[in-house]
């Protein structure tokens, strides 16, 4: 775990600032007595800064608390970086199966069981408009009628707008032809009081994005993450 330290504001403070930071990092084992960064730590940070493929994670709780995550993958393996306020943790992981990625993707959630409801799909732009209208004061129940949500899914949708929910938005990216390229849409996992919901995008034949809402079983989350990143 490392702290994000504000830089010095005056050149006269530089020597004192550097001495204190080196002392702290040496005490933590990040640097050795000769002033060199531990090779493992250096490799983790290099992979996070220059990954071949990655997943960006944004966790949000009902009270507005936020955690950021970054899953970096490359020839050197997989490193997970999590940031909360001014603290960042780096963890090297062996993820050799899609379901092994699920605990990483949902680490900031409340660990709800999969919700039970009839799966349904909506055009992504329609769902975004409904979400905006609800945030601007429209009735959730009126939106359910407008969108034609199945009866079994209505309690889940209502709970998804409750203040007790927590969710993660996942966006994938990769280095391609020398450029960093991120996906246009993301996968979401939402923990509500009635269970976990998976929202995954697919492109329709006309090129429009469609969001599918399904129970958040670990296998489903893993499958969505794999299909989304390939």
Question: Where does each model-flagged region fall?
Answer:
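Accessory beta->alpha helical hairpin/"wing" motif in late/C-terminal subdomains of nucleic-acid enzymes
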Residues: 32-77, 86-98, 102
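Short, amphipathic alpha-helical interface elements at domain boundaries
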Residues: 1-26, 30-49
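Hydrophobic protein-protein interaction segments
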Residues: 132-202
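Conserved small/polar residues in nucleotide/adenosyl-binding loops
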Residues: 229-230
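Short, flexible beta-strand-to-coil junctions
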Residues: 60-63, 73-75, 82-85, 190-194, ...
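Surface-exposed beta-loop interaction hotspot
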Residues: 82-145
């Amino acid at each position: 775990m490392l702290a994000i330290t504000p830089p010095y504001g005056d050149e006269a403070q530089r020597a004192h600032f550097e001495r204190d930071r080196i002392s702290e990092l040496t005490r933590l084992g990040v640097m050795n007595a000769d002033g060199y960064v531990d090779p493992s730590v250096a490799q983790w940070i290099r992979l996070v800064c220059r990954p071949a493929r990655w997943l960006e994670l944004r966790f949000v709780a009902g009270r507005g608390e936020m955690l950021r995550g970054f899953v970096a993958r490359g020839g050197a393996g997989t490193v997970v970086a999590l940031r909360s306020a001014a603290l960042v943790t780096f963890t090297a992981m062996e993820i050799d199966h899609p379901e092994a990625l699920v605990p990483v993707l949902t680490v900031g959630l409340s660990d709800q069981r999969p919700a039970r409801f009839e799966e349904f799909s909506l055009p992504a732009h329609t769902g975004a408009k409904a979400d905006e209208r609800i945030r601007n004061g429209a009735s959730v129940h009126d939106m359910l009628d407008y969108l034609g949500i199945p009866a079994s899914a209505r309690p889940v949708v209502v709970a998804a707008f409750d203040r007790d929910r927590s969710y993660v938005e996942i966006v994938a990216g990769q280095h391609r032809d020398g450029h960093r390229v991120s996906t246009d849409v993301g996968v979401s996992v939402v923990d509500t009081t009635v269970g976990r919901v998976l929202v995954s995008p697919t492109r329709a034949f006309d090129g429009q994005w469609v969001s599918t809402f399904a129970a958040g079983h670990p296998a489903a989350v893993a499958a969505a993450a794999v299909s989304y990143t390939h």
